[in-house]
């Protein structure tokens, strides 16, 4: 089964908790703190594997969770960092943040790696908090929570050339005779319901990848027929071979077919029309094909002002192999002078994929529940909260100082908080002391 979209959830590992411990040895008075740091949580890493062809592996396995780091240990020893969770994806996978829609990365090279969720850092042990004023601190940090996010995956097959056209114009037949691919071929519409990929080698020794894409019909860009299900695969191609049935065996006008398909490509993505097209006049072995071709050329030339450049037309027959060598040589030549097309605007991409906090974002936010409880939230505040060890009084006092330093106390007073009011952070509640 060919699967080219998937929505998954990834969770990086939490950092290990830091430890509170003291050196207790004979003949070592005032041994001091000896608790080590926790280990780093594992990242979730996507790795491109050229052996994969679809996103089928994500159909039944939609949750990926990396291991957490080990806790800090006595004698100042750090906990072991967790191994990264490496997830294999096929070439041509685009990764988006499902919440924002931003493109995180476009994975196109074999072996390429990208961290989609960063593991949390380990919490600090009490060795890190020793000062001249407090040489034996009973303070440690919990490990930082690992990044958690929902991702939308899209597979756009890697092909230099895309074959487009109405159903049953001979795309699959053409692919089968110019490559070793074995697409399903039949005398009915939508015989091809998944993209097929093959490699072409010309007589001069040049090679390129060709994709046979399921047939388009009018309204495909609005979801008619197979809809936009496979239009995305055209986006990676550099050259489009527009296959026209010159025999008009389906009772349609070849020139109207040509205009209709171009309209669907343009409606789906304006940038698709920037790709150079070669018109492939197929089924020239059939009666009336030559007459239809002459009429097609006439209509095309009469309306050439509508096109930036008049496309080349190559008469062929996929059945008899007439004209194939000339077509393939011309395609290879056009590929040589056609650069890669940018798939996404910079505005679509995240400037940098990282796990941190935006300096421009508020450090905290204050709201009030229906029960009159003040609620504190915010990414930075929650990070401090999650890393606080509430089993240790000194850690709690440190957290209170951090809140005061962030201006939380002052902000609560400004909002009207009074002595004894309940304040909630996550599931933790405490009284406000003015």
From Swiss-Prot:
Gene Ontology MF annotations: GTP binding; GTPase activity; magnesium ion binding
Localization: Cytoplasm
Keywords: Cytoplasm, GTP-binding, Hydrolase, Magnesium, Metal-binding, Nucleotide-binding
EC number in record: 3.6.5.-
One Pfam family of this chain: GTP1_OBG
Source taxon at top rank: Bacteria
Disulfide bond entries: none
GO CC terms: cytoplasm
Ranges for domain OCT: 356-434
Residue span(s) of domain OBG-type G: 159-336
Subunit structure: Monomer.
Function: An essential GTPase which binds GTP, GDP and possibly (p)ppGpp with moderate affinity, with high nucleotide exchange rates and a fairly low GTP hydrolysis rate. Plays a role in control of the cell cycle, stress response, ribosome biogenesis and in those bacteria that undergo differentiation, in morphogenesis control.
Name of the protein in its database record: GTPase Obg
Gene: obg
């Amino acid at each position: 089964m060919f699967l080219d979209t998937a929505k998954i959830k990834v969770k990086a590992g939490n950092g290990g908790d830091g430890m509170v411990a003291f050196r207790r040895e004979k003949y070592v008075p005032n041994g001091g703190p000896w608790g080590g740091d926790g280990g780093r949580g594992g990242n979730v890493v996507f790795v491109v594997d050229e052996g994969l062809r679809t996103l089928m592996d994500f159909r039944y396995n939609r949750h990926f969770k990396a291991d957490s780091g080990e806790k800090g240990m006595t004698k100042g020893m750090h906990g072991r960092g967790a191994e990264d969770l490496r997830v294999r994806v096929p070439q041509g996978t685009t990764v988006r943040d499902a919440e924002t829609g931003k493109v995180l990365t476009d994975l196109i090279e074999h072996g390429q790696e990208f961290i989609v969720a960063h593991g949390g850092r380990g919490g600090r042990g009490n060795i890190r908090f020793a000062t001249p004023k407090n040489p034996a601190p009973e303070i440690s940090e919990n490990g930082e929570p690992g990044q958690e996010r929902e991702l939308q995956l899209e597979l756009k097959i890697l092909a230099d050339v895309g074959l487009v056209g109405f159903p049953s114009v001979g795309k699959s037949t053409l692919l089968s005779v110019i490559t070793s691919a074995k697409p399903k071929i039949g005398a009915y519409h939508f015989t091809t319901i998944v993209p097929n990929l093959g490699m072409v080698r010309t007589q001069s020794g040049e090679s390129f990848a060709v994709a046979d894409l399921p047939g388009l019909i009018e309204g495909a860009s609005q979801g008619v027929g197979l809809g936009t299900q496979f239009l995305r695969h055209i986006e990676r191609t550099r050259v489009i071979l527009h296959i026209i049935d010159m025999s008009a065996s389906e009772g349609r006008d070849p020139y109207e077919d040509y205009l209709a398909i171009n309209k669907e490509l343009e409606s789906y993505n304006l940038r698709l029309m920037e790709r150079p097209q070669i018109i492939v006049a197929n089924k020239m072995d059939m009666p009336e094909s030559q007459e239809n071709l002459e009429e097609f050329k006439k209509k095309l030339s009469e309306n050439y002002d509508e096109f930036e450049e008049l496309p080349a037309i190559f008469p062929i027959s996929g059945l008899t192999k007439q004209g194939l060598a000339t077509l393939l040589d011309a395609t290879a030549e056009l590929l040589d002078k056609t650069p890669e097309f940018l798939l996404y605007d910079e505005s679509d991409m995240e400037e940098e994929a990282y796990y941190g906090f935006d300096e421009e974002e508020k450090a905290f936010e204050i709201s009030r529940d229906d029960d009159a409880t003040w609620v504190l939230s915010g990414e930075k505040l929650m990070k401090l909260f999650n890393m606080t060890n509430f089993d240790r009084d000194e850690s709690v006092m440190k957290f209170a100082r951090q809140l005061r330093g962030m201006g939380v106390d002052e902000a609560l007073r400004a909002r009207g908080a009074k002595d004894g009011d309940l304040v909630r952070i996550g599931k933790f509640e405490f009284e406000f002391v003015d």
